[in-house]
Every structure is written in C-alpha cells, then in structure tokens.
Amino acid sequence: MPINAQGYFNALRSYLNTRHYAVTEMDGGRIVLKEKIYPPGSTTPVDQKVRLSITGEALVINLDKKNRTGRSDPLFHFLDDNAKPWSKRCDFVIFHRIGERIKVHCIEFKSASLPDSLVDQLEASEAWCRALHSTIRHYTGETRRLHLTKYVFSCHPNPATYLDPDGKYLLRDHSIRHYLYSDIDGKSLDALDNTNIESIN
C-alpha cells in the first residue's frame, strides 16, 4: 500500500531503533555527524565532525554505532555476522524528506586513504536500506519510493588519484561521490550532489 512521504517518514521514526542509532547532536541548528578517524601522519584518532543544515525533515542513523564494548552490534541479530556480507556497513544513513520525496544518503567517513573496502561498505549499506524497505512492506504493507545515493568523506591529501577526471566520483565505483571534509562541513544536506541515484521501490 503506497503512502505519502510524510506517512512513510513517520513510519521510519516509529519502526527504527532510534534510541540507540539516531544521531541527535546539534550545533547551531545543524546536525552533527561525528566519527573517529586517524588524520594523515597521526597514530592518535580524533573526532571528525561534519555539520550539515537540514531543510525539510531528516532522520540520521549512525549505522556503525558502537556498544559498551566498543564493537558494533549485528544489524541482523538472527544471522551469523562473522565475515558475512551483511556484517559490513557504512557510518551513517540519512533519511531526508523534502516535500513528497524521500532521499537516502549513505555516508562513509575515511581519513587519508580510500581503500577498496569502502565500496563494499557502501554496497552493503544500500542492501541494508533495501532490506529495511522490504521488511516494512512485508509486515505492514506500507511502501514509498526511496532515492538513494552514496558518498565518502575524507581528508585524503591527494584524492585525485582515486577519482574520475572531474574529481568527483570514485574510479572503482562511479556511483560513489567523494567530498573532502573541509568542502562539505557547514553546508546544507541539499548540497550533497550525486547524479547516480538508485531507486528503492
């Protein structure tokens, strides 16, 4: 049963475990994404923050949230998580409602490297979003088209080596848009630009 965007967004708020996974830190009206990274040449991790202003409504999920032991809980508790493809995930998934459109942004934080594994992380996160969408549809009948894009943020000193001639998308996966932290921090969520949009129906 297709429902309107507001209704589906309300359903996401109701069904997701927001008490554990939702990002609620704000700074001057902007949502704060925060993850520990190792800056170039450093052996000590620091909190890397990206502040994004929001138009419409946003539900920010820290998919890689650590528990009390410093590890991430399995995303699917009924499945063996050891070395399985569903054990991978990106750092953040943002559900963003603007009018009658719901966008989904999968975001991975990296430091001074852009390893091949980040492609697997973002692909696994897309699969998680599809699984979530399917689960809600099967159990409740509620459905709404989602528009998904994938991003990696980094402080790589020379990212051009890994990017297309325009310096935007990964050579290994053209659907993943790259931004430097310094270029995106403080901008609007609407500023995230990716022409490769996956539809989840």
How would you describe each model-predicted region?
Residues M1-A83, S199-N201:
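Acidic-basic catalytic patches of nuclease active cores, encompassing PD-(D/E)XK
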Residues N82-S87, L114-H147:
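Acidic, metal/cofactor-coordinating or nucleic-acid-engaging core segments within structured domains
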Residues P85-V93, G99:
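Long, contiguous, structured domain-core segments that constitute the functional module of a protein
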Residues R89, R101-K103, H147:
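A structure-centric signal for secondary-structure junctions around beta-strands
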Residues F92-I94, K103-S111:
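Conserved catalytic cores of phosphodiester-cleaving nucleases, focusing on short active-site segments
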Residues F95-K103, S154-N158:
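Short, flexible beta-strand-to-coil junctions
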Residues S111-P115, P157-A160:
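Short acidic, S/G/P-rich loop/turn micro-motifs used as interaction or catalytic elements
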Residues Y139-N201:
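Domain-level recognition of nuclease-like catalytic cores that cleave nucleotide substrates
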